[in-house]
Amino acid sequence: MSYPGLTIINKTITLPDGREIQIETGKLAKQADGSAVVKLGNAMILATVVSAKEAKPGVDFMPLSVDYQEKFASNGKIPGGFLKRESRLSDYEILISRLVDRAMRPLFPEDFHADTQVAITLISADADVLPDALACLAAQAAMSVSDIPFNGPVSEVRVISLNGEFIINPKPAQIEKAELELIVAASYDNVIMVEGEMSEVSEELMLNAIKVAHDAIRTQCIVLKELESAAGKTEKRTYSHEVNDWDLKKKINDAVYQQVYEVAKLGNANKNTRAEGFKAVKKAYIESLPADHTEDLTLIGKYYHDVEKDAVRNLILDERKRLDGRSLEQIRPIWSEVGYLPSAHGSAIFTRGETQSLTTVTFGTRLDEQMIDSAMFSGNNKLMLHYNFPGFSTGEVKPNRGPGRREVGHGNLAYRAIKKVMPPEIENPYTIRIVSDILESNGSSSMATVCAGTLALMDAGIKIKAPVSGIAMGLITDTKTGRWAVLSDILGDEDHLGDMDFKVTGTEKGITACQMDIKVDGLSYDILSQALQQANRGRLHILSEMKKTLATPREDLKPHAPRMIMIQIPKELIGAVIGPGGKIIQEIQKTSGATVNIEEKDNAGWVSIFSKDKTALDSALSQIKGIVTLPEVGEVYEGKVKSITAFGAFVEFLPGKDGLLHISEIKWERLDTMEGVLEVGETVKVKLVEVDKKTGKYRLSRKVLIPKPEQQATSNS
C-alpha cells in the first residue's frame, strides 16, 4: 500500500524467543514533535511526545507529564458506566504511566525545563502481550524521532524466572507461574529503574534477573539509535539554559560550607531542628549582605541548597556519619503496637524514627470485592491495599483531594509485597481491605506500610505464610574519587540528596517485592549486590523488632469480626444448593441469617458462607452439607414427614431429599391405614434401605430400627 507524501520508517527488534517487535514512525500523529507505533503480535501502542519551545519563567524543575491509556476499542469492548467512554486514568494506567515517567525523567538535561508531555495509548490489544513492558519502548521511539533534548535512549522490559530460566516479555500464563517478575528500565550503559514482585527469592536471583533484562534492553537501545539516525534527529533543538552566576556560587560556598557541614555533623535526630539549623545559616548569610546588594535571592537559595547537598554527602563519605547521627547500616528506633483500634477487625501502629503508619484490616464478602473493568482485564480483586498520605504527616497544609499518583504507586508496592504471603483462598475466603494512614513521615513510609500491614493482618487472625518487613536503601557516590556509601533506612533528606532509592521487602526466607530508582550513571553491579545484602540485614533486624510485638497470627478472629468459611462441592450439585429460581439458597439465608454465595470455578462449585456470628454460620453450613451430602444405603437419618398418602409417608431425610416410608416399613405390626400413625411435620428416625437404580428414588424403613415383637417379648421374659 502506498502513502503519498509520507516517509515511513520501520525497525525490528527480535526478542530472545524469536518474536519480533515492530517499530513504525511517519504514518500517525505527524504534528506531534515525535510519534511512533510499537507492535508485538496484535498489540499496538501509539506514543507521542510534545514539548514547549521555551520554559515558563521561574520554572526550575522538569514539568514532565506521562499518561498511559488503554482504549476499550483496542480489545473490542465498550466502556461501562453511564457515559460509556474512557475517562480519568485507572490505577492500573497510573502505575504504567509512573513506570515510564521514572525511566525517562532522569534523562532530560538538568537545565531543560520546558513543559513536556508523553502520551501513550494502547490502540490494539493482544491477550498474550502485556502492554506495560512495551510502553517505555514506544515512548522512547517517539522521543528518538523528535528534536526534544534527551539523553537516551532508554527502554523497559519485563523479565521473569520460570523453571530455572529467565524469559523476556513473557506471556501472562507464564507470569502466573513465575517465582520472580521484574520490570527493568535502563539505558545502554546504566540500569535506571527496577520494580517487581517475587516469591521469597534470593538476592542473587534478583540481581541475575536484572542483568538478563539489561542485556535485552541494550539490544533495543541499538535499534532505537538506528531509528534516530534514520529519522535525521541526531541533532536536538537548542533551548534557553538556566541563568547562573558562577562567581556567586563560589562566594556562597566559601562563606557557608563549613557552617552547613557543622550543622549536619551535629547528628540531630529531629528533622525540624536540623531544618531550623540550616535555615539559620542561610538567613545569617543573607543578613550579612550589604543593604544595596544586587544578588539574586532565587539564585542564593538555589546555590545554598547545593552547598547543603554537598555538605551532607561529604559528611557521609568522609566520616561515615549521617544527618541524624546514625552509622551507615543503623536502623532508626522502632516501636509497634497491635489491636490499637478496638472496633477494627485488625489494626497496628508501626513507627520507625519519625515515620509512622496506622494500618487497619477489614473483612468483607465476595460482594465487597473490587470490580475491575479495563480494556485488557475484567474481574474482581479480593485483596486491596490503600495508602493515604495527609499533609499533616509532614507538618504541611495540604487540601485532601483524594489519592494522587504517588499514593497509588506506594500502595501498589506494599500490596505486591504482602500479597505473596497471603494464604490460599480456601483458607482465606474473605475480601480484605488494608488501609495505611501515614501519620508521620520522614522517609520509607511505604515500607512502614508493609510492616504495619503485616502486623495488622496477624492481629486480625489471617494465617499469612510468613511476616514481611521492608526497608528503603540509599546511596551516596563521588564519581571523582570513586568513593561510595550504601545507607540503610534512609531519611527523607537522604532520599532527596542521594543517588538511589531502593526499597526491598521480604520474609526471613527471601524477597517478595522491590522498587529501585537510580539517579546516577555508572552504578556497578557490585554496589547493587552490596545494597541487597545490606538490605537483607536491615530487613531481618526490622522483622525481629516486629516479632517482639506479634510473632505469629492470632489463633482466632476478633470476637466482633465476621465469620466466613468456604467449602468445595461437586459441580453438578451447584443447582441443588441454589434451587429453582434461587429458592433453596434464599431459604438457607433466611433461616440461618448468614450470607451465602456460590460460584463455579476450576470445574467445581465453591460455596462461601459469611456471618457475623458463629451460630448462623453453623446453621447455614449444616443445611448446605445436608444438600450436597450423598445419601448412603444403611445410614440412619433423622427426617421430617412432608406428606402422607394411603400407602405410606414421604420423609425428607436430608435437605431437598425425600424418600418413601412405605406403610409396611413403619411398624412390624400390619397397618391397614395411615390414619393416626404419623403426622405431617413429625420428626422420625429412618434408615435408607435402598436406592432404585433406574429412578434414583429412595426407600426408607423405620421398623428396622425397632426390635421385632417376639424379640421384645423374649427380652422382657
Curated annotation (Swiss-Prot):
Catalysed reactions listed for this entry: RNA(n+1) + phosphate = RNA(n) + a ribonucleoside 5'-diphosphate
EC number: 2.7.7.8
GO molecular function: 3'-5'-RNA exonuclease activity; magnesium ion binding; polyribonucleotide nucleotidyltransferase activity; RNA binding
Residue span(s) of domain KH: 562-624
Subcellular location: Cytoplasm
Co-factor(s): Mg(2+)
Entries under CDD domains matching the protein: KH-I_PNPase, RNase_PH_PNPase_2, S1_PNPase
PROSITE patterns to which the protein is assigned, alphabetical: KH_TYPE_1, S1
Domain annotation S1 motif: ranges: 634-703
Top-level class of the enzyme under EC nomenclature: transferase
GO terms classed as biological process: mRNA catabolic process; RNA processing
SUPFAM superfamilies: Eukaryotic type KH-domain (KH-domain type I), Nucleic acid-binding proteins, Ribonuclease PH domain 2-like, Ribosomal protein S5 domain 2-like
Annotated Mg(2+) binding sites: 495, 501
InterPro entries per UniProt: ExoRNase_PH_dom1 (IPR001247), ExoRNase_PH_dom2 (IPR015847), ExoRNase_PH_dom2_sf (IPR036345), KH_dom (IPR004087), KH_dom_type_1 (IPR004088), KH_dom_type_1_sf (IPR036612), NA-bd_OB-fold (IPR012340), PNPase (IPR012162)
GO cellular component: a single term: cytosol
Keywords of the record: Cytoplasm, Magnesium, Metal-binding, Nucleotidyltransferase, RNA-binding, Transferase
Function, in words: Involved in mRNA degradation. Catalyzes the phosphorolysis of single-stranded polyribonucleotides processively in the 3'- to 5'-direction.
Family: Belongs to the polyribonucleotide nucleotidyltransferase family.
The protein's name in its UniProt record: Polyribonucleotide nucleotidyltransferase
Organism expressing this protein natively: Cytophaga hutchinsonii (strain ATCC 33406 / DSM 1761 / CIP 103989 / NBRC 15051 / NCIMB 9469 / D465)
Organism ancestry: Bacteria, Pseudomonadati, Bacteroidota, Cytophagia, Cytophagales
